């Protein structure tokens, strides 16, 4: 049986997308100078939060969505050799539509 991470409430598990390795002019950016990625792929999402009336508020994102998130939001999680971010829904700023 495969082990998975299932976010609770209005939390979202995101796999950050790699930052650019080179500049537009072709210069290689060292790891120490790279910005933290702010874009990632939704791996899984919780069922949504429960409002004051006891109604579950559905999530705005779903598995597979590419999202832009707050630069300093979330908790870094390392699982099975992969790095993820566990974000609150409010830390997700936009969904990238292609």
From Swiss-Prot:
The keyword Chaperone applies. It is found in: Cytoplasm. Keywords: Chaperone, Cytoplasm. Disulfide bonds: none annotated. CDD domains: cpn10. It holds the Pfam family Cpn10. GO terms for molecular function: ATP binding; metal ion binding; protein folding chaperone; protein-folding chaperone binding; unfolded protein binding. InterPro entries: Chaperonin_GroES, Chaperonin_GroES_sf, Chaprnonin_Cpn10_CS, GroES-like_sf. Residues 35-57 are annotated as: Disordered. One of its GO terms (biological process) is chaperone cofactor-dependent protein refolding. One of its GO terms (cellular component) is cytoplasm. Together with the chaperonin GroEL, plays an essential role in assisting protein folding. The GroEL-GroES system forms a nano-cage that allows encapsulation of the non-native substrate proteins and provides a physical environment optimized to promote and accelerate protein folding. GroES binds to the apical surface of the GroEL ring, thereby capping the opening of the GroEL channel. Heptamer of 7 subunits arranged in a ring. Interacts with the chaperonin GroEL. HAMAP family: CH10 (MF_00580). NCBIfam families: PRK00364.1-2, PRK00364.1-6, PRK00364.2-2, PRK00364.2-4, PRK00364.2-5. Belongs to the GroES chaperonin family. This is Co-chaperonin GroES. It comes from Cutibacterium acnes (strain DSM 16379 / KPA171202). The lineage of its organism: Bacteria, Bacillati, Actinomycetota, Actinomycetes, Propionibacteriales.
